[in-house]
Amino acid sequence: MRKSFFGLCLALAVSASGAEIKIAFSDFTASQSPTNFHNALAGTGQPGDWKIVTDESPSAFTPLMPGTAPAARAVRRPVLAQLSQDPADEHFPMFIYDGQVFKDFKLTVPFKIVSGAAEQMAGVVFRFQNASNFYVLRASALGRKVRFYKVVNGIRSDPIGPALDIATNTWHTLAVQCLGNQITCWLDDKPLTATMNDSSFSAGKIGFWTKSDAVSYFGDTTIAFTPIIPPAQALVDSIMKKYPRILGLRIYLPDADGRLRVSASKNKSEIGMAGTDAESNSLTNGAVYYGHGKGTVDVDMPLTDRNGNPIAAVRVQLKSYMLGETRDMVLTRVRIIINEMQKQVLSKTDLME
């Protein structure tokens, strides 16, 4: 399905095994600066000038007939361009996608190196933390090579990759796949190196990269990924698998502004809902609350750390089995569930992303 996400045109598909996002620069008009991105810079100078321009895009090439070579059609489509031309050597403009954090994924990016006197480069950053910590895969037309490296606390590692001719003013494709600590890179569907292993960054954002005065274009970008399940939600999912008869299960945690909200739930549409005084008192004072409805009972209890200090509030909804069921009987049933949750939680960090 196609939707607008904070003004960014993208296509999102979800399957049982994962999801896919297409960042569709071709849906913009010339001179726009795509939203849901932010400018970043490693090194010196000013941030890059990232805008939409029109160009003969890679998707404008189609075969004349099956079995024949692709033929160029005079079709121009919007693409992302980095247009600043700062010749400083240590000048690395980046354009970071803020829509999501990715852990395990495959990123596929069409690119074209257009010009540059000092450098002619284009690349991608991934598992980006900030302008001092990220991975890079980049192609250099002047240097005739493709290189992978990492930046940790502003220090670049030794680059890895082969010597290759990279034609300018020609569309190519970079791809990178991350599975755990395994990283695999391609240029134009050909592997660049053996799969590499690095554990510096386990997840992060993706973005586009250039160097110095390089003017480079980027086409519609695809990210196939496994959605990240927050630890609190993973805990709820595991408890629901063990106790499938639970009618409702929520974990409440303070948000960035200190407001108590549903952080994880059996019903994911409840995530983000505000907590009540009952949950607030469970978290603050360790209080236990009990209530019943038609055929159901609801209990709020604290989830504690290894020292017994409340770190979250939990609401459990169960079916009321008999008319004579007492409050103590219900609390005993709920404590079995809470105790199972406690086995997986030693501190608040066990619930946080």
Language-model region placement:
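Short, aromatic/His-centered strand-loop micro-motif at the edge of beta-sheets
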Residues: V152-T173
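Extracellular glycan-recognition surfaces and repeat-rich motifs
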Residues: Q32-V79, E90-H91
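Short N-terminal helix-loop-first-beta-strand/juxtamembrane motif that initiates sensory/input modules
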Residues: D237-G258, I336, S347-L351
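Short, solvent-exposed beta-strand-to-loop segments that form ligand-recognition rims
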Residues: A163, W186-K211
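A short beta-strand signature within small-molecule sensing/ligand-binding domains used
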Residues: K294-L303
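Secretory/extracellular carbohydrate-interaction modules
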Residues: A74-N153, K211
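Juxtadomain coupling helices with adjacent low-complexity linkers
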Residues: I229-Q233, K319-E353
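Short tryptophan-centered beta-strand motifs in secreted/extracellular beta-sheet-rich domains
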Residues: F25, L107-V109, N169-C185
